[in-house]
Regions:
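Short, cysteine-centered beta-strand-loop-beta hairpins and adjacent loop/turn segments enriched
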Residues: 78-84, 157-161
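Solvent-exposed edge beta-strands and adjacent loop segments
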Residues: 2-80, 129-144
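Short beta-strand and beta-hairpin "edge-sheet" elements
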Residues: 40-42, 110-159
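Short, surface-exposed, polar/charged, turn-prone segments marking secondary-structure boundaries
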Residues: 49, 71, 100-103, 158-162
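Protruding loop/beta-arch "assembly-hinge" segments enriched in small, turn-prone residues
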Residues: 1-11, 144-168
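Short, acidic/charged, Gly/Pro-enriched secondary-structure junctions
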Residues: 85-125
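Short, surface-exposed linear patches
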Residues: 64, 93-101, 152-156
Length: 168
């Protein structure tokens, strides 16, 4: 007799790719949600040093000494009646202008669990400062345009309280 299929965990629900929120700090303390976003992909990669000793009997022994992080996303092209883009896109773009050097080329972002229904995970939220690169996406002859944005971390990301839980 074949074994019974595994039953889903009780009181749990499947998570979806769209259940992640991103904000950019437009001015100090003024966070703007990034709207019309997709393909949001935060990444943190350990920076290691070799800690191998004879006790490891030839095996690797990487020791985490820090991390590098990036946040990539795509924002659908939206234009306001005055011709400008959404405020969050304007903030990302401003950090990539030719005269944006040093702190002018730095943005403050946060990303966090944002479920479609139910409570947000209070422990799945981060923020950091980073340098921005931006390119156009969806550039076909009849595509809905967009922006591919990559924020490359300057220093470590910081664990924060999920802003959705703080608000509610």
């Amino acid at each position: 007799m074949a074994p019974e299929p595994a039953k889903p965990a009780t009181n749990s629900e499947v998570g979806f790719s769209y259940e992640l929120g991103v904000d950019i700090e437009i001015t100090e303390g003024n966070w703007q949600s990034v709207r019309f976003a997709k393909a949001i992909a935060p990444n943190a990669e350990a920076k290691t040093q070799d800690g191998q000793t004879y006790d490891d009997i030839g095996a690797d022994h990487p020791i985490k000494v820090g991390e590098s992080w990036t946040l990539t996303l795509e924002i659908q092209h939206q234009r306001l009646t005055d011709g400008k883009y959404l405020p969050e896109v304007e903030a990302f773009k401003a950090a990539t202008e030719p005269d944006a050097l040093g702190n002018k080329a730095t943005v403050h972002v946060r990303w966090y669990d944002k479920p479609a229904t139910g409570k947000a995970n209070p422990d799945d939220a981060y923020e950091g400062f980073g340098t921005v690169s931006i390119t156009r996406s969806q550039t076909g002859t009849n595509d809905i345009g967009g922006w591919n944005i990559t924020v490359t971390g300057q220093g470590p990301r910081k664990k924060i309280k999920n802003p959705l839980n703080a608000a509610g």
